[in-house]
């Protein structure tokens, strides 16, 4: 590649997204020194590996990545199935593969594989004469999303399965669906809300047994998370303990926070999973409302910048990949912050680039590398 082309590629990199992502990652490292200092070194290594992966992905021709979407998807499906044979159980789920000194969570990389596979389908199925998708044309991408989502769901990892579902639905919506599909989706959503209301919130006369549709099929901890969300003041020493301690931490931070390492909920270890699921609560308690706004602003830059990459992409595959990566990050941030503030049920979803975890860090950096690749090469198409 000529020097001029290389310079143009560097100029076209999504620097706003990359700088904001690095800033969030460094904030996460700083925050982790208070939440769990012993894990700081490992997370710094994960960040270094993630940056190396990001750079490596930008060097690969996007057309090669597109052609490799099918084997990448199938490889990730195979790794998910392998968990049933040699997976390690933690927190009630068979979600980790142990590779020597490392533990890998295949579901994190499956999200990337699903995005690539669905993007390839929508690219290959481009029909200018019939741009809108009806029920039949949506069956293949739905199957591509449902298969890995169900495998993750039976681990069981409900949180990741939900994130995959919302990411897939975002890609389908971006593909332009017919109004009949929108109406059908609305009806399904209303029916789902009705089922939840019937199973968890409908008043039942004394002495009458509640007839449920899905609740009796749920695991005890899953049922408890929904009942705890709907009844936040109940069972504060059991089901709602996590949520209560998190809300105390977030609320007690006030406008400017208590100061680094001065958070009582954090220092006294009242806050559960403070290095992973509830890392935002640590940040809110110690640094306050203003710093939380700064963090949300950085995530906003990542989201808007990612959508900008999709908008400017001259390649349909690249546009769908960019939207998929943006959706993957957005829904995870949305659910995690909603969870720690009590607005959404606790699902065990980590905060991208902030929470401790190698698989999460590297997979998000891989997604950001794809974004950079799409943005840098858009002038070549």
Annotate the PLM regions.
Residues 1-3, 331-381:
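A juxtamembrane structural motif centered on a specific transmembrane helix
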Residues 7-10, 70-78, 248-258:
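Alpha-helical transmembrane segments of integral membrane proteins, especially early/N-terminal helices
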Residues 18-239, 281-341, 366, 370:
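Hydrophobic alpha-helical transmembrane segments of multi-pass inner membrane proteins, especially
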Residues 157-162, 259-263, 274-276, 347, ...:
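Transmembrane helix boundary and interhelical junction motifs in multipass membrane proteins
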Residues 244-290, 317:
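Long extracytoplasmic/lumenal interhelical loops at the membrane interface
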Residues 252, 319-321, 374-380:
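Membrane-interacting alpha-helical segments
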């Amino acid at each position: 590649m000529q020097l001029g082309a290389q310079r143009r590629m560097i100029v076209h990199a999504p620097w706003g997204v990359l700088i904001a992502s690095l800033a969030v990652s460094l904030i996460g490292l700083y925050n982790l020194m208070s939440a769990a200092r012993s894990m700081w070194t490992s997370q710094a290594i994960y960040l270094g590996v993630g940056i190396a992966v990001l750079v490596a992905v930008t060097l690969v021709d996007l057309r090669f990545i597109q052609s490799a979407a099918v084997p990448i998807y199938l490889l990730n499906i195979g790794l998910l199935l392998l968990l049933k044979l040699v997976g390690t159980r933690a927190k009630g789920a068979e979600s980790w593969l142990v590779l020597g000194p490392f533990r890998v969570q295949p579901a994190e990389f499956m999200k990337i594989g699903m995005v690539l596979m669905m993007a390839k389908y929508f690219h290959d199925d481009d029909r200018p004469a019939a741009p809108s998708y009806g029920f039949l044309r949506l069956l293949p991408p739905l199957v591509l999303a449902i298969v890995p989502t169900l495998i993750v769901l039976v681990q069981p990892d409900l949180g990741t399965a939900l994130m995959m579902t919302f990411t897939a639905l975002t890609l389908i919506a971006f593909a332009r669906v017919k109004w009949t599909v929108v109406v059908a989706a609305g009806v399904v959503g209303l029916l789902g809300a009705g089922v939840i209301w019937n199973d968890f919130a409908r008043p039942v006369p004394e002495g009458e047994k509640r007839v449920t549709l899905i609740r009796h099929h749920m695991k005890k901890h899953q049922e408890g998370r929904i009942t705890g969300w709907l009844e936040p003041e109940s069972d504060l020493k059991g089901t709602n303990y996590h949520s209560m301690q998190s809300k105390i931490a977030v609320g007690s931070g006030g406008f400017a926070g208590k100061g680094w390492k001065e958070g009582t909920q954090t220092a006294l270890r009242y806050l559960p999973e403070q290095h992973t699921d509830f890392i935002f609560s640590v940040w809110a308690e110690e640094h306050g409302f203003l710093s939380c706004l700064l963090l949300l602003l950085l995530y906003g830059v990542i989201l808007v910048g990612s959508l900008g990459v999709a908008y400017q992409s001259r390649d349909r595959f690249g546009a769908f990949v960019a939207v998929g990566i943006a959706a993957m990050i957005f829904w995870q941030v949305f659910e995690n912050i909603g969870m720690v503030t009590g607005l959404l049920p606790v699902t065990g979803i980590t905060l991208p680039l902030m929470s401790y975890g190698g698989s999460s860090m590297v997979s998000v950096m891989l997604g950001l590398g794809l974004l950079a690749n799409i943005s840098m090469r858009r002038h070549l198409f």
